[in-house]
Curated annotation (Swiss-Prot):
Organism whose genome encodes this protein: Bacillus subtilis (strain 168)
Gene from which this protein is expressed: mreBH
Induction of expression: Expression is sigma I-dependent.
Disruption phenotype: Disruption of the gene leads to cells that are curved, bent at irregular angles and affected in length and width.
One of the GO biological process terms: cell morphogenesis
Keywords: ATP-binding, Cell shape, Cytoplasm, Membrane, Nucleotide-binding
Protein's UniProt name: Cell shape-determining protein MreBH
Principal location: cytoplasm
A GO molecular-function annotation: ATP binding
Location in or out of the cell: Cytoplasm; Membrane raft
Protein residues bound to ATP: 13-15, 159-161, 207-210, 287-290
Coiled-coil residues: none
Family in the record: Belongs to the FtsA/MreB family.
Function in brief: Forms membrane-associated dynamic filaments that are essential for cell shape determination. Acts by regulating cell wall synthesis and cell elongation, and thus cell shape. A feedback loop between cell geometry and MreBH localization may maintain elongated cell shape by targeting cell wall growth to regions of negative cell wall curvature. Filaments rotate around the cell circumference in concert with the cell wall synthesis enzymes. The process is driven by the cell wall synthesis machinery and does not depend on MreBH polymerization.
Any single Gene Ontology cellular-component annotation: cytoplasm
Length: 335
């Protein structure tokens, strides 16, 4: 009997992950393409392209073809997907032809944005393409019983978006999607350092600062970190010391928007499911779940237990792949 290869793709703003039914996560590559602006030629894709960010001549730019979880540049996304599918085939150890693919999309994406993702994946050789809402994929990947009539609350803080959803009986009961995620927190840090210290730093440095001394809006033991950048006054390299308290303040507004989305979703919850939320709590997934103190801060703010998924960075990809096994129970969430 003929059996197609089945894979799940987490088409993230920051990273693309591929899940194979038999091997689990087989690929995790940055969603970055390096392009020569004069010839429009693609020079590098994925990890190689990310390593070029901020280090290339003026005519070579490293761009992210995905923005806020949806396609910003169709042609480049197709190039990126072709590269990913080729590498995935090698990882599986066979040249798969016409695989069945499930791709996650932000729950707030438009019909046009979803169609663009579906078409791009089909153009890369997929036989069938199913789209699953990101929070549902995250819930499946976090081992929540999404097909049972109990409330599962997922907060997926990705690179481009934060998705908050209450899932019950295979569908989304209440959901809020905001285009704020890890990338925005990085931008907040870049902007703060530029305004306060007249220092220009790159997004990779900002990400490092966020991961090392970034904290959610909760009391913590102060930390410091030395960073280097370009002095905007002299144009020369300069080293400064950043304090964790000022980085916390830089990210404050974006973190409050995330909290607002969580509160709005919980307020929309039907009364019958509210008891489940108090008992079961909220699950955090995505890279943002790794921010220092975010679990404790959210628990304090929403007065509901908050837990971090076992593999927050991979939950969406795992759930996207696993959803093929329960596709008939998830008709509301899979299109």
């Amino acid at each position: 009997m003929f059996q197609s290869t089945e894979i799940g793709i987490d088409l993230g703003t920051a990273n693309i992950l591929v899940y194979s039914k038999n091997k689990g996560i087989i690929l995790n590559e940055p969603s970055v393409v390096a392009v020569d602006t004069t010839t429009k030629a693609v020079l590098a894709i994925g990890a190689d392209a990310k390593n070029m960010i901020g280090k290339t001549p003026g005519k070579i730019v490293a761009v992210r073809p995905m923005k806020d979880g949806v396609i910003a540049d169709y042609d480049m996304t197709t190039d990126l997907l072709k590269h990913i599918m080729k590498k995935a085939a090698k990882s599986i150890g066979m040249s798969f032809r016409k695989p069945n693919v499930v791709v996650c999309t932000p729950s707030g994406s438009t019909a046009v944005e979803r169609r663009a993702i579906s078409d791009a994946v089909k153009n890369c050789g997929a036989k069938n393409v199913h789209l699953i809402e990101e929070p549902v994929a995250a819930a499946i990947g976090a081992d929540l019983p999404v097909d049972e009539p109990v409330a599962n609350v997922v907060v997926d803080i990705g690179g481009g978006t934060t998705e908050v959803a209450i899932i019950s009986f295979g569908g989304v009961v209440s959901c809020h999607s905001i285009r704020i995620g890890g990338d925005q927190l990085d931008e907040d840090i870049v902007s703060f350092v530029r305004k306060k210290y007249n220092l220009l730093i790159g997004e990779r440095t900002a990400e490092q600062v966020k991961m090392e001394i970034g904290h959610a809006l909760i009391e913590h033991i102060p930390e410091a970190m030395e960073i280097r950048g370009r002095d905007l006054v002299t144009g020369l390299p300069k080293t400064i010391m950043l304090q964790s308290n000022e980085i916390q303040d830089a990210m404050r507004e974006s973190l409050l928007h995330i909290l607002e989305a969580i509160r709005a979703t919980l307020e929309d919850c039907p009364p019958e499911l509210s008891g489940d939320i108090v008992d079961r709590g909220v699950i955090l997934t995505g890279g943002g779940a790794l921010l220092n103190g975010i679990k404790e801060w959210l628990t304090e703010e929403i007065v509901v237990p908050v837990h971090v998924a076992q593999n927050p960075l991979e939950s969406v990809a795992i759930g996207t792949g696993r959803s093929l096994e329960v596709i008939d129970k998830l008709q509301k969430a899979i299109k």
